[in-house]
């Protein structure tokens, strides 16, 4: 009888001990995100969360997203500590534009070979994003899949559930002629347009770690975490009659603003009302990118656009700016049957 080598899961490239070490490492940061409605802790087969009692007719709002190829840039530059904030931001910002308060978040982390330090940095960023948005990180999945990813490359995805009072859902139906548009400044490109960003870096031959822009490395501008607007917007909704909110993500101005406009309305954006942050000027120049393409691919310094009645504008601006946002009047809503839903002039 021939002796055969006894194989283990670890021999196949899956290290269960590393996975357990990761869980032990992140328990503390995850615990800090806990909301009173959450029942149980990490490790259950499913996460339990009650609905906050203040809602009379609660409606659940869900969203899922990733961070696109910003992740490739983060991996290339070995910066893993803020990509988790981006992941949460992409999900919770999509929820809050409908008036929803984020309740809980789950993440999916997949890699070819689990590096506990890298995964811990990413998940700590996710926990930080949850703290910024007031939602609980209730669980997730860490998948070590040898042969599916190159080396220690990884991918992340997020899923978030929020709640809104049925009578207070923001869906754009109240938008009308004469409404004013308020912009909320972005922290940079957020998590969109990074395939073009990487192409510009490649074609220009620029090293983002040694190239300086506004006194700091270009890499800092490109990897600045997506701004989370949840707490500022939720307070605004409580105190001001908000008609619509657009989150400027993939598709930029041209595709995201029309998503919240009723028929026979048009958003007119005043381009002179703000200056693009330098990173967008650099991208446009280095890539010779046309203006229309810039507004289709990037947020150009505007993370969200809020539509509200003209008499509410001063109150809204004061409230948003006092909460640390960079907010300004960016345009108006006009009655129009034009197929061009957004005009930038």
Curated annotation (Swiss-Prot):
Keyword Signal: no
Pfam families the record matches: AIRS, AIRS_C
Keyword ATP-binding: yes
Catalysed reactions, as listed in the record: 2-formamido-N(1)-(5-O-phospho-beta-D-ribosyl)acetamidine + ATP = 5-amino-1-(5-phospho-beta-D-ribosyl)imidazole + ADP + phosphate + H(+)
Enzyme class: ligase
InterPro entries: PurM-like_C_dom, PurM-like_C_sf, PurM-like_N, PurM-like_N_sf, PurM_cligase
Cellular component, GO, one term: cytosol
Superkingdom assignment: Bacteria
A single BP term in Gene Ontology: 'de novo' IMP biosynthetic process
Subcellular localization: Cytoplasm
Enzyme Commission (EC) number: 6.3.3.1
Record-level Gene Ontology MF annotations: ATP binding; phosphoribosylamine-glycine ligase activity; phosphoribosylformylglycinamidine cyclo-ligase activity
Entry keyword set: ATP-binding, Cytoplasm, Ligase, Nucleotide-binding, Purine biosynthesis
Chief location category: cytoplasm
Family: Belongs to the AIR synthase family.
PANTHER family: TRIFUNCTIONAL PURINE BIOSYNTHETIC PROTEIN ADENOSINE-3 (PTHR10520:SF12), TRIFUNCTIONAL PURINE BIOSYNTHETIC PROTEIN ADENOSINE-3-RELATED (PTHR10520)
HAMAP family cross-referenced by the UniProt entry: AIRS (MF_00741)
Stated name of the protein: Phosphoribosylformylglycinamidine cyclo-ligase
Species of provenance: Escherichia coli O139:H28 (strain E24377A / ETEC)
């Amino acid at each position: 009888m021939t002796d055969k080598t006894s194989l283990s899961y670890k021999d196949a490239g899956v290290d269960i001990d590393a996975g357990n070490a990761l869980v032990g490492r992140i328990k503390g940061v995850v615990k800090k995100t806990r909301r009173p409605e959450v029942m149980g802790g990490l490790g259950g087969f499913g996460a339990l969360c009650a609905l906050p009692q203040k809602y009379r007719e609660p409606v659940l709002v869900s969203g899922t997203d990733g961070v696109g190829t910003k992740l490739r840039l983060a991996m290339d530059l070995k910066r893993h500590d803020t990509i988790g904030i981006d992941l949460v931001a992409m999900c919770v910002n999509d929820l809050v534009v409908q008036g929803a308060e984020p309740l809980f978040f789950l993440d999916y982390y997949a890699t070819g070979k689990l590096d506990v330090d890298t995964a811990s940095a990413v998940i700590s960023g996710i926990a930080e994003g949850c703290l910024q948005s007031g939602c609980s990180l209730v669980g997730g999945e860490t998948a070590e899949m040898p042969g599916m990813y190159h080396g220690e490359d990884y991918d992340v995805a997020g899923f978030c559930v929020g709640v809104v009072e049925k009578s207070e859902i923001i869906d754009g139906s109240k938008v009308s002629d004469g409404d004013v548009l308020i912009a909320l400044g972005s922290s940079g490109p957020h998590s969109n347009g990074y395939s073009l960003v990487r192409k510009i870096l490649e074609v220009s031959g620029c090293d983002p770690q040694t190239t300086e822009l506004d006194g700091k490395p270009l890499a800092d501008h490109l990897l600045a975490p997506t701004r989370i607007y949840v707490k500022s917007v939720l307070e605004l909704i409580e105190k001001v009659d908000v008609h619509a909110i657009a989150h400027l993500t993939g598709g930029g101005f041209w595709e995201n603003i029309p998503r919240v406009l009723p028929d026979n309305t048009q958003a007119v954006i005043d381009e002179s009302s703000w200056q693009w942050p330098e990173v967008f000027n650099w991208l446009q120049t280095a890539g010779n990118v046309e203006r229309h393409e810039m507004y289709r691919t990037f947020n150009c310094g505007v993370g969200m656009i809020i539509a509200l009645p003209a008499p509410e504008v001063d109150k809204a601006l004061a409230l948003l700016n006092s909460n640390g946002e960079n907010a300004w009047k960016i345009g108006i809503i006009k009655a129009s049957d034009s197929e061009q839903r957004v005009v930038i002039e």
